[in-house]
Amino acid sequence: GLSSHELNQPGCYRDVKDTTVTGLFKLTPDSVAQLDEAQDLNSWGDTYFIAWTTTPWTLPSNTALCVGPKFDYVSIQTYNPYSAQPINIIMAYERVSAYLSAEGEVAKDVDLPAFSKGDKIVPYKIINHHKGEELEGLHYEQLMPWVKPTEKVDSNAAPFITNYAQAHPDKVFVAANNKDHFVEMESEAFRVILGDYVTTDDGTGIVHIAPTFGADDAKVAKDAHIPALYLINKKGETRPMVDLQGKYYNLVELDQNFVDKCVDVVEYHKHEGDYVKNATILNLIQMVFGM
C-alpha cells in the first residue's frame, strides 16, 4: 500500500481530464400517466429522469435509478440544449441551479420562450414537486436496449431470483454447456428505487445503478429486487456489458442460447467491439508513483 508520506509528496495530485455523462432516462407512458402533471408533460414533450455519472462505461449495465426518499424532486419543462427539442426532466430541486441558469426560469403560468441551438440561456419552468418516495416504482425505458437483464439460477441466487424463476418457467434457459441455468428478468428492471445514501452534493440527486459494477450498487439493487445486466460467455460465466476498458464484447464470445433468448442481435451488432464514448471534465484525482 501507499504510505501517507508518499501521498503527500509534491506533485502527487494533479488536475486531469476525467469522464462524465448526464444521462437521459425516458419514462414509460404508463409512468408519466401516474404523475399529477401528466397532461402538461405530454403536451410539451418526452419526459426523462436525468442522472449524472463519472463512470459512463457502466451505463450499458444500468438497471435502476435511485432517489432519496425525503428529497424534493421537480418536473421541469425545458429544452434539450444540444438539439433544442422540447423535453421534460425530473431531478432534485436543490440541484436545478447546477444545470439551469436562474435567468432562464419563467413562472408556471407563462409560456416558455423559443430556444435555438447555440443560445446561451435555456428557458425552463418548474411545473410540479414530488418527494422522492412518490417516484418509487416508476419505470423508464432501458438506456441501451440490446440485452435483457438475466440472473443465474443456482444455490447462491438471491431468493427474489429463485422465486421469479419458479413463477416464470418460460423465462428460464440453460446455457449451451447444458449445466448452468439462467432466468431472463426484464420485467423487474428499469424502475426507480429508494436509497438513503443518495445526496444532493453533486449530480442531479438521481443515482444511476449498475449492479455489475460495485458492491454498493449490487447491494441496493439486491435489496430492491432489481436484476443485474450480464453477458454470458461460452463457458457459461457471467460478464459485465463492457470490459474494464469500456469496450463491448463481440457476439462470437457469447453463449448462443443466451444470445437467442436475451440479445437483440441486429442492434447489438452495431456496437460490438466498440468503446463507450465519453465526455470529459476536469476532476482532481491523485496521481501516485508509477501512474
What feature does the model see in each segment?
Residues 37-49, 56-291:
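Non-cofactor substrate-recognition interfaces
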